[in-house]
Curated annotation (Swiss-Prot):
CDD domains: Knot1 (cd00107)
Domain of life: Eukaryota
Lineage: Eukaryota, Viridiplantae, Streptophyta, Embryophyta, Tracheophyta
Listed SUPFAM superfamilies: Scorpion toxin-like
Function field: Has antifungal activity. Inhibits spore germination in F.graminearum (IC(50)=15 ug/ml), F.oxysporum (IC(50)=102 ug/ml), F.verticillioides (IC(50)=8.5 ug/ml) and D.maydis (IC(50)=12.5 ug/ml), but not in C.graminicola, B.cinerea and H.sativum at concentrations below 30 ug/ml. Inhibits hyphal development in P.infestans (IC(50)=25.5 ug/ml), but not release of zoospores. At concentrations above 100 ug/ml, induces morphological changes such as lysis of hyphae and sporangia in P.infestans.
Residue stretches in coiled coil: none
Disulfide bridges in this chain: 3-47, 14-34, 20-41, 24-43
Family statement drawn from the similarity comment of this UniProt entry: Belongs to the DEFL family.
Any single biological process term in GO: defense response to fungus
This protein's UniProt keywords: Antimicrobial, Defensin, Disulfide bond, Fungicide, Plant defense
Organism name: Echinochloa crus-galli (Barnyard grass)
SMART domains per record: Knot1
Matches recorded under PROSITE patterns: GAMMA_THIONIN
Protein name in the entry: Defensin Ec-AMP-D1
Record-linked Pfam families: Gamma-thionin (PF00304)
Length: 47
């Protein structure tokens, strides 16, 4: 199962999944992706 949590450190609109994922990795997650119309960065990890 994969859990998602909105990034606390990511600033601005999320356009590229790779940028979001690298910020999420500094927060202790395995990756991340942009979600939704407004482009929020959500971090993912196995749970």
């Amino acid at each position: 199962r994969e859990c998602q949590s909105q990034s606390h450190r990511y600033k601005g609109a999320c356009v590229h999944d790779t940028n979001c994922a690298s910020v999420c990795q500094t927060e202790g997650f395995s990756g991340g992706k942009c979600v939704g119309f407004r482009g929020r960065c959500f971090c993912t990890k196995a749970c």
